[in-house]
Amino acid sequence: MTEKINLLNLSEPELQGFIASQGQPLYRATQLLQWIHQRGVTDFSLMTDLSKPFRQQLSEASFVRVPELALERVSADGTHKWLFRLADNNKIETVFIPDRKRGTLCVSSQVGCALNCSFCATGKEGFNRNLTLAEIIGQVWLAARLLKSPYKITNVVMMGMGEPLLNYEAVVAAMHLMMHDHAYGLSKYRVTLSTSGVIPAMRRLREESPVSLAVSLHAPNDALRNVLIPLNKKYSLDQLIPLCRDYYSRGSKRCVTFEYVMIEGMNDRLIDAKRLIRLLADVPCKINLIPFNSFQGTAYRCSTESAISVFQKCLMDAGFNTRVRRTRGDDIAGACGQLAGQFHDRTGRHQRWVQKQGHDFNRPIPAIDH
């Protein structure tokens, strides 16, 4: 007996292939996209513009399954955080951040993260596995149905648990559905992928997906970035910055956004701002300064308001479009850097994955004078 297929786990071309295998015309794929993503219907018997024989055929060959809601918390500032349970009992977190007329959904791409960035809570939990397409787009599907008026998803950022470009195929397929007119219909300007700088995948993304790009920079030189983002030892700034400079075509109004977490005494001094100005001198970009969010076990502290203000002014005086991304949802552990998955890596998957990459991102790093 042929195993049933989760239609939520199919990209548009794969869905068309499935429809063809059922002897149906391709426009049925469009109808299914609309029923599943726009109307949120998962019961084939309710898809009334499909013939009864085809609905029966679908129920025998396929199903639609999204992650389960395990926990919901709502912050005083309107931020929503959901803990979703996957079929294998792993859990991921998704956050919705309302802001005036904008509603941004922060989506996870992996269970945990292997990069072990020293300022991020998620990395401390280790890496378990990549999410499937169904588990990524399922977060959007669920959030759209869980949110109550007046909240609405206008933007999606791939900034949740995990490094999106280390789960390339599933992430790009999910973003395509986010932008698809018959699914979620978001503009390419409203879907953003954030990466720590996986250079080969960034080059591929530039050619294959029109989404907006954000880069987790967080340091003005390699010495400090090696401490904050160990991936930098593999893909250093002399590779990353030229790619960011040329990521969008000349004359384009689009530019890369750099994210820079503000950590007291680590990367928030005036000399750090001046080094950052030199580093990005010829790079069309925007800069988001992110106050560090503390988590259990970290020795880092957030920069003071005055230090952040001085840092921002220095960058703006040099001509950089710079804003401070204010902390949201910190009363429910939903702010950036606090997306620690509630699981324990008992299987050794994390170390096996790291070894497969040929680089030990978790090797202890000696103290340096940056």
From Swiss-Prot:
* S-S bonds: C106-C336
- The residue ranges of the Radical SAM core domain are 99-331
Q: Which UniProt keywords apply?
A: 4Fe-4S, Cytoplasm, Disulfide bond, Iron, Iron-sulfur, Metal-binding, Methyltransferase, rRNA processing, S-adenosyl-L-methionine, Transferase, tRNA processing
Name where it's found: Cytoplasm
Question: What is its cofactor?
Answer: [4Fe-4S] cluster
Q: What is its EC number?
A: 2.1.1.192
EC class, as a word, reads transferase
- GO-annotated cellular components: cytoplasm
Q: Which InterPro entries match?
A: Aldolase_TIM, Methyltransferase_A, RlmN_N, RNA_MTrfase_RlmN, rRNA_lsu_MTrfase_RlmN/Cfr, rSAM
Q: Which GO terms describe its biological process?
A: rRNA base methylation; tRNA methylation
The record's catalysed reaction(s) read:
adenosine(2503) in 23S rRNA + 2 reduced [2Fe-2S]-[ferredoxin] + 2 S-adenosyl-L-methionine = 2-methyladenosine(2503) in 23S rRNA + 5'-deoxyadenosine + L-methionine + 2 oxidized [2Fe-2S]-[ferredoxin] + S-adenosyl-L-homocysteine; adenosine(37) in tRNA + 2 reduced [2Fe-2S]-[ferredoxin] + 2 S-adenosyl-L-methionine = 2-methyladenosine(37) in tRNA + 5'-deoxyadenosine + L-methionine + 2 oxidized [2Fe-2S]-[ferredoxin] + S-adenosyl-L-homocysteine
Binding-site list for [4Fe-4S] cluster: C113, C117, C120
Q: What is its main location?
A: cytoplasm
Cofactor: how and how many bound = Binds 1 [4Fe-4S] cluster. The cluster is coordinated with 3 cysteines and an exchangeable S-adenosyl-L-methionine.
Residue positions annotated to bind S-adenosyl-L-methionine are G162, E163, S194, S216, L217, H218, N293
The note filed under miscellaneous reads:
Reaction proceeds by a ping-pong mechanism involving intermediate methylation of a conserved cysteine residue.
Q: Could you tell me what this protein is called? A: Dual-specificity RNA methyltransferase RlmN
- What organism is the protein native to? Coxiella burnetii (strain CbuG_Q212) (Coxiella burnetii (strain Q212))
